[in-house]
Amino acid sequence: METVLNSCEIRVLGCLVEKELATPEYYPLTLNALTAACNQKSNRDPVMALEDADVVRALDSLRMKGFARQSAEGVRAMKYCHCLAEKFLLEPPDLAVLAELLVRGPQTVGELRTRAERMRPFADLAAVEEVLRMLMEREEPLVTRLPRQPGRKEQRYAHLLAGAPEAEGEESMAPPEGARLQVRAENERVARLEEEVTALRAEVAELRRMMEEFRSQFE
């Protein structure tokens, strides 16, 4: 894919899609609800321990890339939702399979059918295979079939939103160049924001000092 997401963005996006389908009554999600969803112990691989700041950074990046947006429904608290359906013209069955791949990584057809049940029931394995076929045969594929692992009968499928997955057993000495550049850009952006906050705090402190001096002239 042209746009590559990092692991935190993948988890945030997957949780937004999952919660829309599994618990629509609580969707869109507040920051607290989204962070809790990202750090769930169940239905997650790997289990993560993200802070609110991590989720906010991921949301900002996803919004800039057109994968998520702030919901107008968030009156008292800011709420967030995904844009996958509009961005890629996906139907609920597509979203259910993709969400499962986003939050749990590569899986077999059987695993996807069982685990996606909480979001969208599939009549049989053929129904899941059809969704996977459509996601793979798009002009811009969203899913790929992985090579069969030694000793395993079934092949697994993986999403492509984080780029092409590494071959099984392959150890990467360094992250892909695209991901490395994204992380560097994100770190630089955060550093700039921190510098701006520091400068603003200094200005506020100086204004307070000047105000105190001004008041003291009339006491």
Swiss-Prot record:
<comment type="similarity">
    <text>Belongs to the UPF0502 family.</text>
</comment>
<dbReference type="InterPro" id="IPR036388">
    <property type="entry name" value="WH-like_DNA-bd_sf"/>
</dbReference>
<dbReference type="InterPro" id="IPR007432">
    <property type="entry name" value="DUF480"/>
</dbReference>
<dbReference type="Pfam" id="PF04337">
    <property type="entry name" value="DUF480"/>
</dbReference>
<dbReference type="InterPro" id="IPR036390">
    <property type="entry name" value="WH_DNA-bd_sf"/>
</dbReference>
<protein>
    <recommendedName>
        <fullName>UPF0502 protein Gmet_0262</fullName>
    </recommendedName>
</protein>
